[in-house]
Amino acid sequence: MRTFQVGVRRASFTLTSSTGGEVFSLSSSCLPFSTHFRLCSTTRSLAIVSAFIIGFTLTVIMKWEHIVWLAASTVGASPLLQFGQGGTFDYPGLRFAADKKFSITVFSDLHLGEPAWTGVGKGPDADWKTIGVMNSVLNSEHSNMVVLNGDLTSCEFVAPENVTAIIDQVTAPLVERNMPFAATFGNHDMSKTCSTRIMSEHMWHNIKGKDGKKLSFTTSSVSGPYEKIGTSNYYIPIYSSSGGGNPHLSMLLWFFDSKGGRDFQKADSDGNDVPVEGWVDDKVTSWFTLTRDAVNQQQGRVIPSLAFVHIPPHATRAYQDSKPDGTTRPGLNEELIGHQGDVCDSNNNCSYSGADTYFMKALVETEGLLGVFSGHDHGVDWCMKWAKELPNNSPANGNGLNLCFNRHSGYGGYSDWARGGRQIVVEEAKLDEIETWIRLEDGSISGHVTLNSTYGQDRYPTVAALKSTGL
C-alpha cells in the first residue's frame, strides 16, 4: 500500500548528469566495412555491430514515442511522462498537447450516493443523471485531463463497503475515455463511514483506462494525522509540447485538501460524529511554499501554476460582500459563500476564525499562480480578480490573484441551477493568462472570460441563473 509520507512523489531537485562510458571510433584504423569487415579484430567488429544495433533501437524507440505522443494528443488525453522522461525535473506528469494547449475539465460537487429519502429527485437516478452531465460536458470539450474538485460523494449516506463502488461509478466516464484525472476531496467526502485515503488508494491502484494504464494522479505528499492534514495535497507537473522524450517543465498544478466533514470511524463521548476543521492546514501550506521555492530554484525561473481546493478561501466572501458589478465577474451569485476558516457550534452558528490566513498569504505570494479554483458553494460560479484591498480579510490585497468557482456538477446536493463543468484552457505561448468558461449540461456555454491583466475591468454579458429541467 502506498504510504502517506512527505515526498511520496517528490521531484529530484538535481540536474541529470551525462553517463560516462567508452566511445568507439569507427575510423580508418579499421579497413572499409563493405569489403574488409571480416579482417577487423573481433573486439572492433563487435563494437561496430553493437553500435549499429543500439543506434537502430534508439531510433525506433524515439520514433515510436513520438507517434504515441501524437496519437494521444489527437484523441485528447495528454501523454503521461514517467520517471526519467522529464529532463532535469524527473517527476511523472502530463504535457501540453500537439496544438500547444492544455485543457482541463473541472467537475465539482457531484454528491453521488444520496438515498431517495433525502429529497425529491435524489437516489440512484440522480447519480446516473450526474454521470450524464459528465458525459455531456466531456463530449463537448477536447480535454487533456479532468479535475474532480471535491464532494465527489455524499459519503455520510454511504456504507463503508460501498465506497469503492461509488468511486468506480464517478470515474467511469474517465475510464471510458482513457482520461487522466486528479481529485481533491471535500467536506462531504470525509465522514464517519468514509476515508478519503481509502478513496485515494483505490483511485491510484485500481482506476485504469481501457488500455490498462493507470489514470489517477491523486495522492498525498504530506504526512500527518488524517483529521489535520487530510489526503489530497500534491502537485502534477505539466511539460512542454516540444522536446520529444525530454521536454522542459512548463507549468505546475497544485492540489490542496481543505478537509471539513466528519472524522473517519470516530465518535465523541456522547456517540456523536467528530467534526473536522474546514481549512488547509498550516503544515500543508509550509510544504507548499518549500516545494514551490525548491522547484523555482532548481529550474532557475518562476514556474506558472494553477491551484485546486474544494472549500474556497475567505477572500471570496470578502469580495462578495463588496457587491462587485456582475458584468466584471460574470457568473451565478445566488448564495452567500461558505469558506475556509469558519468555526461552527452544534446549532450551525458559524464565525470566521482566520484559520486560512497563512494559506491565503502563501497563495498571494506565489509568483506565476494564474488562478485558484474551488467548489463547495453550489450557487456561485464566477471568477474574481483580487486586485484591491478587501475589508476584514488578511492579507487585504491579493496582488491580482484570480479566484474562481466551479459550477455545481451533480444532481446530488442542494440547488436547482443548471448543471455543468468548468473548462480551463492554457496556451503554451501565453502562460500569463487563462481562458475559461462553464460548459452546461445542454451543451451551451456560460460565463466565458479571459483571466488576464485587465480581468476585473473588462465587461462581459451577465449570466442567467438557468434552472435544471426535470427536477
Provide a role label for each language-model segment:
Residues 55, 61-79:
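Fungal secretory targeting signals
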Residues 76-170:
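N-terminal active-site segment of His-dependent metallophosphoesterases
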Residues 80, 238, 253, 380-471:
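Binuclear metal-dependent phosphoesterase catalytic core
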Residues 80-96, 166-300:
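Extended active-site neighborhood of metal-dependent phosphoesterases/phosphodiesterases
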Residues 101-114, 250-260, 264, 308, ...:
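Active-site-proximal beta-strand elements of phosphoester/diester hydrolases
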Residues 113-116, 154-157, 183-195, 262-264, ...:
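Active-site environment of divalent metal-dependent phosphoester hydrolases
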Residues 141-144, 252-255, 267-381:
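His/acidic metal-ligating clusters that form di-metal
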